[in-house]
Regions:
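Glycine-rich FAD pyrophosphate-binding loop
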Residues: 28-49
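Active-site substrate-recognition segment that forms the wall
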Residues: 26-29, 53-55, 73, 77, ...
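Helical element adjacent to the flavin cofactor pocket in flavoenzyme catalytic cores
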Residues: 144-202
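Dinucleotide-binding Rossmann-like beta1-alpha1 core, especially the glycine-rich loop
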Residues: 53-131, 251-256, 262, 294, ...
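Glycine/proline-enriched, intrinsically flexible loops and inter-domain linkers
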Residues: 384-491
Length: 491
């Protein structure tokens, strides 16, 4: 790919991972051919290249589920368009439950999937072990099977998008570092690179784990931080079924997929760590991180119990690589406030392969139409306050997002990290009265008050939580007599 730069473009895309290549592909396919993508090193060399490649359609919201569903459609079509095989295998997926709470959550997810026309159905233990014969089913209550899920090759998929972008007229330049996004009068005017300046009407920050620092130069908050993420690949396993479904054991914190006659299994860590707290090395390209055995031993023991063949199979690859996680588990996707023409797509929480095609299309459609073409409000960059893009906060908060990936997704679940940052003058007085605090945009706000003899801690449920009656009593007291409500955090 050429590194010769043009002087002007309608759109400059920064970052050659799956997100940047997806935006370029969908803009060019939509008729916007005056598009140039700039990559500091080589395509996929940041975090895309080492992704596990899982493709699961059911995500945490309507928008992200729509992204993933579209992604599966594109995976089945893009080879015919570009000649590049994305390595998609529609093996299906199975998610298992080891307790009643998890089983209830999986059944709720299956109901949610059906709203999108995604096939999902319950499997009992006998059916699960028939499809996943290597599993120890002790303690498994059942699971959910999604036949249209699968996996893809991250590099091949990204290269397919890049090839499609070029076929439709976009330009891709590697080994070009963007040093600054240029602005004037509250809107972008272009970018300054180490090889010259490009004037542009729109700039898209798809910088992955570099996106935060790039955005900070222009006062654009991109609340993400790189965290260490492990996976292991076994030696070849005789007679391993090639059509083995992707397996997710949320309670064990593990996911599994067949990988060319081997098993790849990764972890949603119980004790996640931020990476590059002093900055990402300038030379970073296709790099891996040191593998620290103590960081994964707890989850590895659970993995060996769940799939006993690990106890007698060698490990070929011990891998640790950086993945970007956001402060609240949501993407940052959209136009930055007060910076007309500055768009961001980053912080996708290790879902880039399954969400990249759809997220890139959503942003490309927004740029071409001049407005969002679907509800993307949950990802709005305007939700981010300045302090939420600061390093100290993100280094504490973002690893919790990784930890919670496979935790129970309770309604109203409270984060435990980076708490107590913003308090009103009434904080201590209300705490003395039994306030159980919840956090909203950093503010500690009483969710309910515990009566004498009750500890003010949240419990969680898909039904009425244990503190429901206490909250009901407060509501009645305010309705029938009087109450004091602290609104000082609203300014």
């Amino acid at each position: 790919m050429t590194s010769h730069l043009t002087e002007r473009a309608s759109v400059v895309i920064i970052g050659g991972g799956i997100m940047g290549c997806s935006v370029a592909y969908h803009l060019a396919k939509g008729g916007w051919t005056d598009v140039i993508l700039l990559e500091r090193k080589t395509l996929t060399s940041g975090t895309t290249w080492h992704a596990a490649g899982l493709v699961g359609q059911l995500q945490g919201s309507h928008a992200t589920t729509a992204f993933a569903s579209y992604g599966v459609e594109l995976l089945q079509e893009i080879e015919a368009e570009t000649g590049q095989n994305p390595g998609f295998r529609r093996s299906g997926s199975i998610s298992i439950a080891l307790n009643d709470e998890r089983m209830a959550e999986l059944k709720r997810k299956a109901d949610f999937a059906r709203l999108f026309g995604v096939e999902a159905h319950y499997m009992d233990t006998a059916q699960i072990v028939e499809r996943w014969p290597l599993m120890n089913v002790d303690g498994v209550l059942g699971g959910i099977h999604m036949p249209s899920d699968g996996s893809a090759n991250p590099i091949d998929l990204t290269q397919a998008l890049a090839k499609g972008a070029r076929l439709h007229g976009a330009k891709i330049c590697e080994h070009v570092k963007v040093e600054e996004v240029l602005t004037s009068g509250g809107r972008v005017t272009g970018v300054r690179t180490d090889q010259g300046t490009i004037l542009a009407h729109h700039v898209v920050n798809c910088g992955g784990m570099w996106a935060r620092d790039l955005g900070r130069q222009n006062g654009v908050g991109v609340p993400l931080h790189a965290c260490e993420h492990y996976y292991l690949v076994t030696e070849p396993i005789p007679d391993l079924p090639s059509d083995l479904p992707v397996l997710r054991s949320y309670c064990d914190g593990t996911y599994w997929k067949e990988d060319a006659g081997k098993l790849l299994f990764g972890f949603a860590h119980f004790h996640a760590k931020p990476w590059a707290t002093n900055g990402i090395p300038e030379s970073f390209e296709f790099d891996s991180l040191p593998f620290v055995e103590e960081d994964v031993m707890e989850v590895l023991q659970l993995a060996m119990n769940r799939v006993p063949v690990l106890q007698e199979t060698g490990i070929r690859t011990f891998f640790n690589g950086p993945e970007s996680y956001s402060h609240d588990g949501r993407f940052t996707l959209g136009e930055a406030p007060d910076r007309k023409g500055y768009f961001v797509l980053a912080g996708v929480n290790s879902t880039g392969i399954q969400s990249g095609a759809g997220a890139g299309k959503a942003l490309a459609d927004w740029i071409m139409a001049g407005h969002p073409t679907m509800d993307l409000s949950e990802m709005d960059p305007a939700r981010i306050e300045d302090w939420q893009a600061r390093d100290a906060y993100l280094q504490e908060r973002c690893p919790e997002t990784l930890v919670l990936t496979y935790a129970m997704h309770w309604p109203g679940r409270q984060r435990q990290s980076a708490r107590g940052l913003r308090r009103t003058p009434f904080y201590h007085a209300m705490k003395a009265r039994g306030a159980a605090y919840a956090e909203v945009q950093g503010w500690e706000r009483p969710g309910w008050f515990a009566p004498d003899g009750v500890t003010p801690n949240y419990d969680h449920s898909f039904h009425r939580p244990g503190w429901f009656d206490h909250m009901l009593a407060e509501q009645r007291a305010v309705r029938e007599t009087a109450g004091l409500i602290d609104y000082s955090m609203l300014g």
